[in-house]
């Protein structure tokens, strides 16, 4: 059940926004206060740059899960001088009290947990629309939807036929929203694109979209790949998923994980964390992989590496973590045992062929938990309609690990906004010394004390005493 959106007029905030309930703002503020104690990186950036305000003049269109942790990110960007407009990058991931806390500060936010796809694309458009008729000059993206909207809309201005044949439900609503906007303002997207100085991207999926544009020569502005900062991918993707996956499964189903047979599809950083998560609670975990290196890693960690087709009838829990398309298809779904749990922790909902299940009997148990009766008579439990389970059925990653990721995001925004003319129309990563700085900012909070190199030791391994300590090609 979607909460009725509350408009800014009703709130009398003097700011345009769409949220579920402004009365949750006080609750959101209390949780924000707790989160700040677990986000030392962001707090350090506020202290370091708060007076200087390096983002003064930045107009940031933010498309990223509207959680309590994201609210801390937003407040940091504003503290550093930026103007911000924000939408969630997933229809189920918003925490309504977090959105209310941001709206109460007169920051434009457009996010409601359980929003429709039509609303989702409307809200993504809203972050590109400044009240004075201007445009954003920066994008902070998660999954690439805001960047992709600007790019596809620009193409449609030149050739409307690119919107003729949507391939799925998501594209149907996306294409309709672009057509609607073009009817109102035929040059909206090209004007917006021309103003963008750079984009910073949070996720593996969004980064892949950026590299694809770079390869084809279509990338119109510099981009920073935040995902491949070591302090993002090796922490958020791995340790974040290690805690949030089982949290979401247990909140959704109350199932006992110990003793269950679980299959994790994909053994990248997200898959590694997911496998550890399930094993840690006593599940017997198998891995499905296409990459021989990742498959060998899984085998060496003691996981059984299998093909989905060979074990689909045995597994109690299925988790997709690939970032790919149609990983679990209808022929697999129909063979699953009774009460098998099916979920996705990759970015988009098309890893599982949810569309093929629409003709079956659905019984909604509670928000984002559905029983689906298969032709065999067996029922499977689908979580978050195949979208991100840890944000749909729980609250995502813990604050501490998100501080790593979001500290990288702020540094990337500062870098592109203040030095954008030094970058070409390519995808970059943050330099190693900033990666190490992000890690250093988080050590005190967990009581970690660094050993220091002597000058002789540093010379012996040919690194500066103060770092960086590893070459760029080092894999960690």
UniProtKB/Swiss-Prot annotation:
Residues that, per the record, bind NAD(+): 203-205, 237, 266-271, 289, 324, 345-347, 390
Names of required cofactors: NAD(+)
Record key words, sorted: Cytoplasm, Hydrolase, NAD, One-carbon metabolism
Residues the record lists as binding substrate: 67, 142, 202, 232, 236
The keyword ATP-binding belongs to this UniProt entry's keyword annotation: no
Principal cellular location given in the protein's record: cytoplasm
One Pfam family of this chain: AdoHcyase
Molecular function GO terms recorded: adenosylhomocysteinase activity
Gene Ontology terms: biological process: L-homocysteine biosynthetic process; one-carbon metabolic process; S-adenosylmethionine cycle
Catalytic activity: S-adenosyl-L-homocysteine + H2O = L-homocysteine + adenosine
Record keyword Ribonucleoprotein present: no
Enzyme Commission number: 3.13.2.1
HAMAP family the UniProt entry points to: AdoHcyase
Annotated family: Belongs to the adenosylhomocysteinase family.
Protein name: Adenosylhomocysteinase
């Amino acid at each position: 059940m979607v909460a009725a959106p509350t408009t800014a007029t009703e709130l009398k905030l003097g700011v345009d926004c769409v949220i579920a309930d402004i009365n949750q703002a006080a609750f959101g503020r209390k949780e924000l206060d707790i989160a700040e104690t677990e986000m030392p990186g962001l707090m350090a950036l506020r202290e370091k740059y708060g007076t200087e305000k390096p983002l003064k003049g930045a107009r940031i269109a933010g498309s990223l899960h509207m959680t309590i942790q994201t609210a801390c990110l937003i407040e940091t960007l504003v503290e550093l001088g930026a103007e911000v407009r924000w939408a969630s990058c997933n229809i189920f991931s918003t925490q309504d009290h977090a959105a209310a806390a941001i709206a109460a500060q007169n920051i434009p936010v457009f996010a409601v947990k359980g929003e429709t796809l039509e609303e989702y694309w409307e809200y993504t458009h809203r972050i590109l629309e400044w009240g004075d008729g201007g445009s954003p000059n920066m994008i902070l993206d998660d999954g690439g939807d805001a960047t992709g909207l600007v790019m596809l809309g620009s193409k449609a201005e030149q050739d409307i036929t690119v919107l003729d044949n949507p391939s799925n439900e998501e594209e149907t609503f996306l294409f309709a929203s672009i057509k609607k906007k073009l009817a109102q303002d035929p040059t909206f997207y090209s004007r917006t694109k021309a103003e963008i100085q750079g984009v910073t991207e949070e996720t593996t999926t969004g980064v892949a979209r950026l590299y694809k544009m770079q390869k084809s020569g279509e990338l119109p502005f510099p981009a920073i790949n935040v995902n491949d900062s070591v302090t993002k991918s090796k922490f958020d993707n791995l340790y974040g998923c290690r805690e949030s996956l089982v949290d979401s499964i247990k909140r959704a189903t109350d199932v006992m994980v110990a003793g269950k047979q679980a299959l994790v599809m994909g053994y990248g950083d997200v898959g590694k964390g997911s496998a550890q998560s399930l094993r840690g609670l006593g599940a017997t975990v198998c891995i499905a992989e296409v990459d021989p290196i990742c498959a060998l890693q899984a085998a060496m960690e003691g996981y059984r590496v299998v093909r989905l087709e060979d074990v689909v009838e045995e597994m109690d829990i299925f988790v997709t973590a690939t970032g790919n398309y149609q990983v679990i298809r209808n022929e697999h779904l129909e063979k699953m045992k009774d009460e098998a749990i099916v979920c996705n922790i990759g970015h988009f909902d098309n890893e599982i062929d949810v569309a093929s299940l629409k003709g079956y009997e659905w019984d909604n148990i509670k928000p984002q938990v559905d029983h689906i009766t298969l032709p065999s008579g067996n029922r499977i439990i689908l979580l978050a309609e195949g979208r991100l389970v840890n944000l749909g059925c729980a609250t995502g990653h813990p604050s501490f690990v998100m501080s790593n990721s979001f500290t990288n995001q702020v540094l990337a925004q500062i870098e592109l906004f203040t030095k954008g003319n030094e970058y070409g129309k390519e995808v970059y990563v943050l330099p190693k010394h900033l990666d190490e700085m992000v890690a250093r900012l988080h050590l005190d909070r967990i009581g970690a004390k660094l050993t220091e190199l002597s000058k002789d030791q540093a010379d012996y391994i040919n690194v500066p005493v103060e770092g960086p300590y590893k070459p760029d090609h080092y894999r960690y």
